[in-house]
Amino acid sequence: MPQSMVASLASDGYRAALQEASKKNKLNVDPFQVSRVKRISNRLIANATYFKPEASQWAWEINIEDSNEVNAYCMPGGKIMVYSGLIRKLNATDDELAAVIGHEISHALREHGRERMSTAAVQQLGLIGFAAYISNTNSRNRANATMQAVSLGTTLFFALPNSRTQEREADAIGLELAARSGFNPFASVTLWEKMKRQDTKKPPEFLSTHPSDDNRIRELTDLAYKLKPLYESNRPR
């Protein structure tokens, strides 16, 4: 799927999510937490170009939806949403929030959303052919078709889990991104341990697409030790 199509679908889907949250008076309701999440995210964004220079041209956005969900995402093109449940239920520290947001940013930097959407579109939904149809219809049909494409693209982004390979890649890049930004990489370990404790009753939404296990925690611990010198050289003094 062309990057321009993915970016357009992501932007439109993000706009729809913002409008829905705003309609329910759930968007950016806590100024302190909004300021906090933006401060953390902006430190990560400042170092994102190390992994993808084009990220400096992205129209980054950062918002918080008031929700009990323990979750966050970064759509293609840098559209970040953090659910307040992630902060409240886990009592997340700045370093732990950086671990989650850095992980989600890494999915966008490596275009994992595009890969997932493209695979599903080609194999099941024919979205590329559908896009060609959009470009050749009259304006009214085009508007209706575009709305369907936005819904479809957003559904694909949220519904399809990342592969284990994509998760490992986002773990590694996200942790390095956090360390380069001066956040403690060991916070990823404490975060996943908190997630696992939440998992004893009802699994957090984050775990439905980001499965946690002891192997993953061990891998994160090993990565954190390797990245400790990088963190030490970049942490705030």
Please identify what each model-predicted range represents.
Residues M1-R237:
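A Zn2+-metalloprotease active-site environment signal
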